[in-house]
Amino acid sequence: MKLPVSSPFEDYVKPLPAGDRAALADFFSGFDSHCILAKAEKRKLREDFEKVILYYVNLNLSLGRALELLDPANLGGFYARPAVLWFPLDDAAKIYPLSMKPGSMSVFRLSVYLKEPVVPELLQMALDFTIRRFPSFATTLKKGFFWHYLDTAKRRFTVSRESDIPCRPLKVSQSGSPAFRVLYWDRRISVEFFHVLTDGTGGMVFLKALTEEYLRLKGIDACVDKGPWALGETPSPEEFENAFARIEQSSSSSGFVERAALQMSGRLSENRPCRVLHFRMDAAGLHEAAKKYRATVTVYLLALMFMAGKAATDQMKGEQSIQVPVNMRKFYPSKTVRNFSLYCGIRLPIEKIGDMEAMTGEISRQLESKGSKEAMNRMLTGTERLVNSLRFVPLAVKQPAARLIYGFLGDKIFTNTLSNMGVVQLPDRMAKEIEAMDFVLGTAISNRASCSLVTVNNTAMFSIAKLTADPSFEEKLYELLKRDGVEVKVEGSELYES
């Protein structure tokens, strides 16, 4: 007969003085009052607390201080109430589940690089505490008769050690499966989101809140509970609204049909992405390079991408087109962490790609025109009219047609993408703990490169998610940056090829 084996936490508790055991009993009584999860999920959540208590004890932190940092009140009422909320998809999100195919899903990734290795137990605890502040993320994707929707999932959301290709599809078809994942590797914390949940702005709010909570558990005051997304605040409806619905329709609408754009010529990989590269640059140096052409950083990088794209294609005629997301919050201030972005396409004939002064001028003109409030309103009106026309079409009929339309319109009309998150603002004490950030877009169906940029602490990280092993695009981009005096440190993965 096998005797039951005690856990490391039970071994720790047995020799404690009666006062400490009583304090732990009171602590876990408080935990019980904050958690009504199913038995298995509750056990996992309790074990998260036990592991962090042991971590603190091994650091010679007093039990009293450990229990103070881990106060079950940080769970709020999230785990103590049954699931009742559900969220209709916002206007931009509705296409994403319709267009899913095996191995293909609109996923993006945000990462923060700390100055010390990540402690997995603390990151898991930080997620346990943070998720209650983001009820629209604590959901699972479900099918309605006409549309998909997000249904609240009361569960313990899991942190995992990174072991796979970035931006792999999430298994949202499984019951209760989340539409995001939290990963760690060495000093990096990453969150990957299915675009049905949020856009880059909303994702960054979540990553910052998660990182702040992680640092608090590390004993670092990173200004938690002092901003609008303090974990102790009660979520408000405007933080999870479909902000598109507040915008009045334009008198005219813009269509979605564009001419097919030139594609880079490298052979498509079976792995999506087949490689992720990061160009780490001094943000001030990058800004100075752009100023030489009287351009913004976005315009400057778009010009370089057009030149690199020309070097990566065998086509001699036609147009390149780069998709540029447009954050609607700059036109309509909103607290929402759901999708509130549209896009425009910057197009240049391949024969006019070459002269930087001419290109930056034309790109600036197109960005100002196509990315304007009026142009975005026309696109939104067109989107809403399309959505309304499909409103009462059963989901089973909509999905096959949407896959076909998305595959043609969403991919063939662009050569690649540039999404610039801009400069991320952090509290000073938090910024001191962070070395850099990165932002990675999942690959499209046939676009060979998806590019993104995020800047923090004067470090600009330009990321390229590749869909071909052909290195022509990134090699030309590197050459052009060096030509303009920008120091570039290339980081990233090897080829994910068998």
PLM segments and residue spans:
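Acyl-thioester-dependent acyl-group transfer interface
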Residues: M1-H148, K154-F180, K310-S498
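A secondary-structure boundary/capping signal
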Residues: L114, E192-F193
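Short amphipathic alpha-helical segments
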Residues: V297-F306
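Alpha-helical hinge/cap motifs
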Residues: H195, A290-T298
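Non-catalytic, low-complexity flexible loops and terminal extensions
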Residues: K2, D11, K42-L63, R188, ...
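Hydrophobic (often cysteine-bearing) scaffold residues that line and stabilize catalytic clefts
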Residues: V119, D199-G203, V297-T298
